[in-house]
Amino acid sequence: MKPLNIIFAGTPDFAAQHLQALLQSQHNVLAVYTQPDKPAGRGQTLRASAVKILAEKHHIPVYQPKSLRKVEVQEHLSKLNADVMVVVAYGLILPLAVLQTFPLGCLNVHGSLLPRWRGAAPIQRAIWAGDKKTGVTIMQMNEGLDTGDMLHKVCCDITPTETSTSLYTKLANIAPKALLEVLDGLEQGLFKAEVQDESLSNYAEKLSKEEAKLDWSLSAEQLERCIRAFNPWPMSYFVTQDSQGTLQTLKVYQASVLPHQNKPCGTILAADKRGIQVATANGVLNLEQLQPAGKKPMSARDLLNSRADWFKIGQVL
């Protein structure tokens, strides 16, 4: 088994963890492709991606084209003479010319058990939908969106308290090893390509701040899953009104489900040290950890000590 010459394409920390694994392996990373530096923070200063920072630390050439569609970009890729391209959360579309550049193709690490969740937010949607299991898939890329033939899958459980943050960490711990296993056996054909079953596919739409607003006409179970799925971004939230009539927005970090009470959706049923209990279409959502604007997250008990007027029994949110 000879070491492979690899082009790595990725952008966030999740991708950087895969690059780190490659750098510690027998394989050679010839170059790294990552998205252009983006403005960040209040000062909107340009910030390099996690992948770029790691690559430069190891003196690996970094390229940041805005697109891979230009002929000169594709020609440069070809001249690098790599065996394979590894793509992890890169964020740019790979045109057919790029997909056909490398003898062993382009491999992608995807954060779901394909074809269950294709698209931009597979980790979040798995929690949102109430899936009990998820995992990572290593696939050969084609022109479709996460539609390529699957080479290797690794599973992990989704616990009842799982957030996107914790699940992201789980997948980041198992995915690099899965990638290396595929790379080590790629030339020998040790991994048989499996065509995806289109009838089992779902599209994991991007999350939005609009979707993160709690909709009390859903069930308490659905809302509790939303709260976990949308943590750390965009964070589920709701709006209440204080005694002065001012609207107050609160993010929700933690909640639990209580038995149903026959009250209109959005009605505050109780507000005490156990939490703020709100009626939903099915069941009661008990809000346990919240964050008012400009404050740190706090327990419902601590919030009620200073802001009890925000939560009147019988008030409809």
UniProtKB/Swiss-Prot annotation:
This is Methionyl-tRNA formyltransferase. One of its GO terms (molecular function) is methionyl-tRNA formyltransferase activity. Attaches a formyl group to the free amino group of methionyl-tRNA(fMet). The formyl group appears to play a dual role in the initiator identity of N-formylmethionyl-tRNA by promoting its recognition by IF2 and preventing the misappropriation of this tRNA by the elongation apparatus. Pfam families: Formyl_trans_C, Formyl_trans_N. Keywords: Protein biosynthesis, Transferase. Disulfide bonds: none annotated. (6S)-5,6,7,8-tetrahydrofolate binds at S112, L113, L114, P115. It catalyses: L-methionyl-tRNA(fMet) + (6R)-10-formyltetrahydrofolate = N-formyl-L-methionyl-tRNA(fMet) + (6S)-5,6,7,8-tetrahydrofolate + H(+). It is an enzyme of class 2 (transferase). It comes from Histophilus somni (strain 2336) (Haemophilus somnus). Its EC number is 2.1.2.9. One of its GO terms (cellular component) is cytosol. Belongs to the Fmt family. InterPro entries: Fmt, Formyl_trans_C, Formyl_trans_C_sf, Formyl_transf_N, Formyl_transf_N_sf, Formyl_transferase-like_C_sf, GART_AS, Met-tRNA-FMT_C.
